[in-house]
Amino acid sequence: MTTAKLVIDNLTKSFDGQHLANNHISLEISPAKITAFLGHNGAGKSTFLKILSGKQEPTTGNVSLETGKRMSVLEQDHFAYDQFTILETVLRGNKKMFEIKEEMDALYAKPDFSDEDGIKAGELGVIYDEMGGWNAETDAQTMLSNVGIKEDMHYQMMSELENKDKVRVLLAQALFGNPDVLILDEPTNDLDIDTIAWLEDFLADYENTVIVVSHDRHFLDAVCTHIGDLDYSKLNLYTGNYSYWYQASQLATKQRAQANKKAEEKKKELQEFIARFSSNVAKAKQATARKKMLDKLNIEEIKPTSRRYPAIIFDMEREA
């Protein structure tokens, strides 16, 4: 099995030419990595995911995925599939496979089925087989059962479901068919602890690219291999799970603050020397040298995080 890399090149999204949701973001997200994107409400996470999934266009830059690779996104519109059965909703998660099946069914249903139709149907059948289509319904039913949708519900209409069950069906749809890139926005919402545990195990064994946004710190600790921290429209990457990111980001801020403190002390010392000896002929050269040192001294502006609290992920009481 070949795997796909998602490439993000110089991505910027601005609104009204002023407000930046994302600013010059470039990175490659490789297979077998689960990357979570963190940030306060309004930091640009949702905009970023919409651009990655093709639902929004960036102001500049681009997102590329190898031709023929499939991206699957956890649907946020809980009414989008109300006219379909639960099982069909999941099968529609693999759009190309579903369209091939529909085309084959339409050919076989023709009252004037011709030899040409037979050849075309045969060709489609080969592609369908290569995609695992003949096992698709069984795979979809298994996925539904894994997320807590009982077998006797699989042929119900989506419109008949409560919202908490729609969430599970749409999660099964996103996971169905082994997509090359999987984008999950708040995947643990409305899930019980057993289903979350199953999802954690599923993702731990997943060999393709996963991108996730979640407020469930426990979930992020369990599944993430990388963290992307969106703050002030910029992206900082960390290797590790949520807890590692939190510790590393706090340490980095502390180290920058300590370096700034030393630089400020050095600046004060140089300024005092220059003020004291700049008019002293004997010390003029030393004063000039210190002036050059002062000009080169770099004191980084450290902004406080744009979050209300250092960590945007809050503790959640998981359902039993």
Q: What are these regions, as identified by a protein language model?
A:
Residues 1-14, 303-320:
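ABC-family P-loop ATPase nucleotide-binding domain
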Residues 248-297, 301:
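Intracellular alpha-helical coupling/juxtamembrane segments of multi-pass membrane proteins
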Residues 2, 10, 52, 163-165, ...:
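Short alpha-helical segments used as structural interaction elements across diverse proteins
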Residues 4, 216, 220, 290:
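Hydrophobic (often cysteine-bearing) scaffold residues that line and stabilize catalytic clefts
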Residues 5, 71, 146, 271, ...:
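A residue-level signal for beta-strand positions that form part of recognition/binding surfaces
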Residues 127, 271-279, 310-315:
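Alpha-helical coupling/stalk and coiled-coil linker elements that connect catalytic or binding modules
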Residues 13-19, 23-260, 314-320:
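ABC ATP-binding cassette signature C-motif
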